[in-house]
UniProtKB/Swiss-Prot annotation:
Has antifungal activity against T.rubrum. Blocks voltage-dependent N-type calcium channels (Cav2.2 / CACNA1B). Keywords: Antimicrobial, Calcium channel impairing toxin, Disulfide bond, Fungicide, Ion channel impairing toxin, Secreted, Signal, Toxin, Voltage-gated calcium channel impairing toxin. GO terms for molecular function: calcium channel inhibitor activity; toxin activity. Belongs to the diapausin family. The keyword Nucleotide-binding does not apply. This is Diapause-specific peptide. It holds the Pfam family Antimicrobial_6. The keyword Signal applies. Residues 1-24 form the signal peptide. Highly expressed in the fat body.
Amino acid sequence: MGAALKMTIFLLIVACAMIATTEAAVRIGPCDQVCPRIVPERHECCRAHGRSGYAYCSGGGMYCN
């Protein structure tokens, strides 16, 4: 395969993985105040609200997987 085709396939796989992660994340309002804190505290808040762990913070809202 050519280098361009390999790169295109790789980028498609990365994009699909990012979409799957983003789509699985759910905003957890009570954890919004934890966004500025360290990552272990974010994970703990998500787990305390029945989720598997911290995904990301965006616009002051915390999203958990």
